[in-house]
Amino acid sequence: MKKLALLLTACLILAPLAAKDDDKKKGKKPKKETIEVCFVLDTTGSMGGLIEGAKQKIWAIANEILASEPTPNLRIGLIGYRDRKEAYVTQVHDLSDDIDDIYAKLMKFQAQGGGDTPESVNQALHEAVTKIKWNKSKKVLKLVFLVGDAPPHMDYQDDVKYPEICKLAAKKNLILNTVQCGSMASTTPIWKEIAKLAEGDFVAIAQSGGVAAISTPVDAEIAKLNRELGITVVAYGDSDKRRVVRGKIALAAEAKEEGAADRLSVLSFKSKAVAEVSGVGAADFTSAYVDGGGDLVDDLASGRVDFDEVENEKLSEEVRKMSKEERKKYLEEQVAKRKELQK
């Protein structure tokens, strides 16, 4: 997984550097990059270690991308694939800038089934190119990462085969990178060919993904802060939106200690980018805790919603029952707690 993170970071961050350096030489402010990434993951049983590693590392990878200056617009998509006659052939989740939502979808991936080779690689890769709603601009960096251990079925007559898929990718300015897990001999030449045909990179990593959770002395403290910040969230929106927000908070609270810091950092980077665009000064800046909106405390702290403009029907039943005075006091306390915790 370390090699995968390094490959991803190199492709995402180093690729735009030349253009940024040119801007600096000309005295221009570097333009904000837009980056779109789709992970195409083999979710059969042999990939258990890698899938669990991805769940641990997705925040770290997003953090690495967002740390570049200026903070890029990042959208991530996911495709999980197995094979025909399995519980599913593919599960497609389109590009989203809501990293909390992507994390929730990734958490639902379980490595099961398989046991034989090959797998439905061609179908998954074709859907990454044709079903994902990629930005049509040539200025947007668009990357696919095919991660798996088994070669594609070449005997499915109704499949579009990978050589043709690579041609389609080129027409859409997509770069296809391949990550081979383990050392299955029949996979290596195909993974290398896909990367070569689609101007991408190939890397081989251990079947387990090489994930080692490294804790630091402050991890427990940050995990505690993560949970305390979650308590300050007031879900706001229609019933579906409030349900989604509650789900995100629950997943965040369960995040492993070593992942909590990366998650908070990602949200801080994204909030600062929004603040820069809207002209909010550093002294007034408050980081969001829930990606994708739906947190009234964040809306109030950022000035998007005024205390007197809170819509009753968008509140949970518990908060709705409060008198107007009680509600305002409660919300002011939550905003104050959020700011105190984020000092």
Language model segments and positions:
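Hydrophobic h-region of N-terminal signal peptides that target proteins for export
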Residues: A10-A18
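Positively charged n-region of N-terminal signal peptides that target proteins for export
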Residues: M1-L4
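C-terminal "exit" segments of structured domains
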Residues: K196-A198, F202-D306, E332, K337-K343
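Divalent cation-coordinating acidic motifs and surrounding scaffolds
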Residues: A19-D219, D299-N312, S316-R320, K324-E326, ...
